[in-house]
Amino acid sequence: MLRQILGQAKKHPSLIPLFVFIGAGGTGAALYVMRLALFNPDVSWDRKNNPEPWNKLGPNEQYKFYSVNVDYSKLKKEGPDF
């Protein structure tokens, strides 16, 4: 398959940016899904030892991908412990 892509790129050099952007998009999507699966508190891989991982998050921990206006280090806890 890689040989076929390289052959097409040699015959039609205008396809090279297309291959680069498709490869970068696929790689970015795979990395984002891996980040969600490993670091998101909504995902629990071990239900016996950690059934509710979202309860262990502190109020100053950021688990969003990107936050524009919120400084999580200055947030205070507003609720009971469970």
From Swiss-Prot:
Membrane topology (UniProt): Single-pass membrane protein
GO CC terms: mitochondrial inner membrane; mitochondrion; respiratory chain complex I; respiratory chain complex IV
Ranges that cross the membrane: 15-37
Localization per record: Mitochondrion inner membrane
Mitochondrial matrix side: 1-14
Disulfide bond annotation, renumbered to this chain: none
Key words, A-Z: Acetylation, Electron transport, Membrane, Mitochondrion, Mitochondrion inner membrane, Phosphoprotein, Respiratory chain, Transmembrane, Transmembrane helix, Transport
Membrane side Mitochondrial intermembrane: residue ranges: 38-82
Pfam families named among the record's database cross-references: B12D
InterPro entries reported in the protein's UniProt record: B12D
Record-listed N6-acetyllysine modification sites: K10
GO molecular function, one term: protein-containing complex binding
Phosphoserine modification, residue list: S67
Stated role: Component of the cytochrome c oxidase, the last enzyme in the mitochondrial electron transport chain which drives oxidative phosphorylation. The respiratory chain contains 3 multisubunit complexes succinate dehydrogenase (complex II, CII), ubiquinol-cytochrome c oxidoreductase (cytochrome b-c1 complex, complex III, CIII) and cytochrome c oxidase (complex IV, CIV), that cooperate to transfer electrons derived from NADH and succinate to molecular oxygen, creating an electrochemical gradient over the inner membrane that drives transmembrane transport and the ATP synthase.
Assembly, per entry: Component of the cytochrome c oxidase (complex IV, CIV), a multisubunit enzyme composed of 14 subunits. The complex is composed of a catalytic core of 3 subunits MT-CO1, MT-CO2 and MT-CO3, encoded in the mitochondrial DNA, and 11 supernumerary subunits COX4I, COX5A, COX5B, COX6A, COX6B, COX6C, COX7A, COX7B, COX7C, COX8 and NDUFA4, which are encoded in the nuclear genome.
Family to which the UniProt record says this protein belongs: Belongs to the complex IV NDUFA4 subunit family.
Protein name (record): Cytochrome c oxidase subunit NDUFA4
Organism in which the protein naturally occurs: Mus musculus
